[in-house]
Design a protein with these regions (language model features):
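Generic structural signal for well-ordered, non-membrane alpha-helical segments
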Residues: 14, 18-21, 25, 29, ...
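A residue-level signal for conserved active-site and pocket-lining positions in enzyme catalytic cores
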Residues: 53, 89, 252
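Glycine-rich ThDP/TPP pyrophosphate-binding loop and its adjacent helix/strand module
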Residues: 63-71, 75-77, 116-295
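Alpha-helical support elements that line or immediately flank enzyme active sites
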Residues: 88-99
Length: 295
């Protein structure tokens, strides 16, 4: 299915591009499973759920310079706030050429640049913020957005957050501030999978109507009902981009499935932070055959 790129009025992605994105996503799932299995530690559930989104964002939507720089001048920049989904982040960065894919084999090892939660201390290309503590990424992204405005850099800032992360009060200060200051060059995406470490978000602390809350704070809101469909993701991102620089910050509500692509991990918080055993790894890899070559 082809869709319209709302910014350039061209049909995109093509079938060839869609196939490429699907192949990268499948390989990314393999990377995630193998990374957390090797060290018997990590967060596969949310990583799998955001694979399609991050693959599409980095490969088809974001404007990225060939060489990574922390200042991000004259390019779009991305902040991962829910840093526990580092496996998918590292895989996407590696598959985009930020660093060698073989380095994925060092995930969570001592002295590795690929720690369980991303940090800037290791100097890993693509990582702009340490994001172990939840609820801080949006504030930093808003600061970066203001910096771009001051420097007359007409590129965008993206931030990915978890839905359970909205239970952190700092987010709501940031949400209020961004609208009050017309920070209209930011696109914040909320991964709405309805799961967090202790159970469903409804059982832990109900989020209520997230769309209504963001709109009441002065944000434009785009909903992607199938956040695991690449075509829908692309369309939603392009629609979000078309809403930028119009006086309001933009929020995407991305409705994903925890553990998507591995049947026994789907729809449950139990795989928020648990690694598969040998048998489970084999099943997961069979469901996601190698497409780009394993590291």
């Amino acid at each position: 299915m082809n869709i319209v790129n709302l910014n350039c009025n061209q049909i995109k992605p093509t079938m060839q591009e869609l196939e490429k994105l699907n192949n990268i996503t499948t390989q990314t799932r393999r990377d995630i499973l193998r990374m957390v299995h090797k060290v018997n530690s990590g967060h596969p559930g949310g990583s799998l759920g955001c694979a399609e989104f991050l693959v599409t964002l980095f490969n088809s939507v974001m404007k990225r310079n060939d060489d990574f720089s922390m200042d991000g001048i004259n390019e779009d920049i991305f902040f991962l706030s829910n840093g526990h989904i580092s496996p998918v982040f590292y895989s996407v960065l590696a598959r985009c050429g930020y660093f060698d894919v073989d380095e994925l084999n060092t995930f969570r090892l001592i002295n590795s640049r690929l720690q369980g939660h991303p940090t800037t201390h290791e100097g890993l290309p693509g990582v702009r913020i340490a994001s172990g503590s939840l609820g801080q990424g949006l504030s930093v992204a808003i600061g970066a957005s203001l910096s771009k405005k001051i420097n007359k850099d007409d590129n965008l800032v993206y931030c990915l957050m978890g839905d359970g992360e909205l239970q952190e009060g700092q987010n709501w200060e940031a949400i209020m501030y961004a609208a009050a200051k017309n920070v209209d060059n930011i696109i914040a995406t909320i991964d709405l999978n309805g799961q967090q470490i202790d159970g469903s978000t409804d059982d832990v602390i109900k989020l209520g109507n997230v769309r209504t809350k963001f709109e009441s704070f002065g944000w434009d809101v785009i909903e992607i009902d199938n956040g695991n469909n690449i075509t829908d993701i692309f369309n939603g991102l392009e629609k979000a981009k078309s809403k930028t620089f119009l006086g309001k910050p933009v929020c995407i509500l991305l409705k994903t499935i925890m553990g998507n692509g591995v049947d026994f991990m789907m729809h449950t918080h139990e795989w928020h932070g648990k690694a598969p055993n040998d048998e489970q790894l084999e099943i997961g890899l069979k469901q996601n055959p190698e497409t780009l070559g394993d590291y």
